[in-house]
Amino acid sequence: PDLDTLRGRPRMPRDQIYRAGKTGNNMCGIVGYTGGKNAVRVLLDTLSNLEYRGYDSAGISVFGDNGIETVKAKGRLQNLADLLAHEHAKLSGHCGIGHTRWATHGEPSDLNAHPHATEKLSLVHNGIIENYQQLKASLTAQGYTFVSRTDTEVAAKLIDSLYRGDPVAAIIKAQELLEGSYAFGILFADHPGEIFATRQGSPLIAAAGNGEAFIASDVPAILKYTRD
């Protein structure tokens, strides 16, 4: 599907937001997987194929035994792999999203690393939200608090504020408010096994087949798994 949405154009049709799992020069890396394989292993492997893009932190969110579980770490991808091999060795699942971050808003840190999560969702992002300060002020007035200095956390909580049980509707409403370039991969807590993704300006590809689906910022991330 064509995932591109341009601000000022007619509202994006519902079938133009990519839903996986149900029958500028920004160099962050996004991956997502849903299928029969171990999602933790697939996410780490696909993220390793995006290391050439440069990054300062990495993280993943996976549908585990306790809902969406998120692990992230400053520094090299190996730091994340070590956390997953030891402190979070029990994390397992078949659907998740991953991210390597190149800082644009907020210094490199565990808190600023992606994914950014709320009780309702977890989100990874490549791009720059130009009006995030205005959106953050509006969300703060609604009672939201922020733990990072990133525009990504603002995007996550904006979608959270608009969510009424329909992921596609919430994403469309958020896109009407967001200014800038972005690609999102999103898990919704009440939609286990599914990934929702959309983009405006920033690169994002989607592939599906043989009972599994992928999203990625670039082809090399998933080339060994699929060519569809």
Regions found by a protein language model. Name each.
Residues D2-R9:
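Extreme N-terminal basic, low-complexity initiation segments
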